[in-house]
């Protein structure tokens, strides 16, 4: 029985395995049938990973939730084509789904609004359309449809493991206290999350490879724990670990070569047909015209007027043509592979990404792979030891515990990226680039969003005169128009309020005049007094007591004034009286009613007679009480 159960368990693991070889991922990708090459798919993978990261930061989601959303997106496109499923929609769905899986729920309405605003952050007019009911309901229905598709595609498998925990546990067991090693290893894990390594190897292999490269980069020897080598702490086999390290080195070397040979940026942009194919495929499973780059929907308008900008795209305008750097550089990269002799006339993708956000490396960009020096597998030496990349990294540490949810701020005006030999590849000064950017910005810069809303700084690669002039002419009229309308509306509101206050003041002045009460009815007088202020009307005429009934006289006297007599502190007792007699006695002895000035003379006779009656009654009561006592 044990053998059969173990066999069934292994078969189930194989059936629901999410790990494939590198050849399987490249050969059997469903996007290949729709004309999307491996390079295109890799570039789009970087786009939706950056988009998920930016939206997650805006929603203040923890790092684990963001990583889970990225893994959901990776697994979805293992079985679905990029050309038939818009990655913006799928990425938004994965964020919403990951927030529920990781017990960090975020309202669907908020996810939709933030994701839509992130997609159209360069075009505030289009981003504000999400507040319209019809646009919002359309996006909501699209996200709910996409959620069902993602759930069925990933087979309702929510068990996702990340390399963060194995990495932290191993560093704690090995006693690694160097913050630089921890930071570089953590950033490596985040970098591999944007590649297919997380679809090829289990998390402990990625954690082990990241720690090894970080130690070699910092020239730190990994210690031995309990008589075992360091990689035993990850429970990994040496042969697969060597394969993981080989792929990591290849990616590092490829990035280093791209940065080592930057190309000039003065060239004409060519539209990227692959991106248009993704959004406009007639066989799309999720049709979302409002999210497509070249949408012809009347709600969005001409795509050239407000081209959709993704989380890692930056718009430049040269010769009246809108083009994003990731698209342009991807087409240039493909052309360079076909024409090696024309490499000097093309611009690489990483040259644009290298100076993104003013040359500053934000926390979620992590330490770029190009900053890692070439690691020789035979010698395992670090070419450059004193490189200052970790200073600009984002994640912070508290003692020995690495906080995966921390978000750091900018850390300086300059960041140097080094290649082979430790030479500086770029030195971007934030002060020198301020003159290139237009003086009026559409987006707001906030430290919490970590440059999510910053203007594109890839203009520095383009012509500093023509490109900046066209960019400024593109931005300034919209901003000035909006400010002008706001000022006009404020003026109208102020004038209307002042006019209303003046009318009210004049009306109160008219109402404040003395108007005889005899000329007004009771309702009119009450209305006048309520509007001008409550004034108690005095009774000037005298009403004779004999003209009033007993109830009327009592009511009048109560209105004219009641004087409370001395307080009776004696204990309450009936004193042998009936209840009615006792109440009458207490009322007469405790309350003294003073008549108004108009009826004092007329009431004096009645009061004297009343006293005589009360005295006689008291005498009778007193005798009866004495008789009862005796």
UniProtKB/Swiss-Prot annotation:
| GO terms under cellular component | cyclin/CDK positive transcription elongation factor complex; nucleus
Concerning its family, UniProt says:
Belongs to the cyclin family. Cyclin T subfamily.
Q: Which InterPro entries match?
A: Cyclin-like_dom, Cyclin-like_sf, Cyclin/Ssn8, Cyclin_N
Q: Bias regions of kind Polar residues — which residues?
A: 421-439
Q: Which molecular function terms from Gene Ontology are attached? A: cyclin-dependent protein serine/threonine kinase activator activity
Tell me which Gene3D superfamilies the record gives. Cyclin-like (1.10.472.10)
- What's one GO BP annotation on this UniProt entry? positive regulation of DNA-templated transcription, elongation
Q: What is this protein called?
A: Cyclin-T1-2
Bias kind Low complexity: ranges: 288-297
State the residue spans of region: Disordered: 288-313, 410-439
Disulfide bridge map: none
Q: Which SMART domains does this one have?
A: CYCLIN
Q: Which UniProt keywords apply?
A: Cyclin
Q: Which Pfam families match?
A: Cyclin_N (PF00134)
* Record keyword Manganese present: no
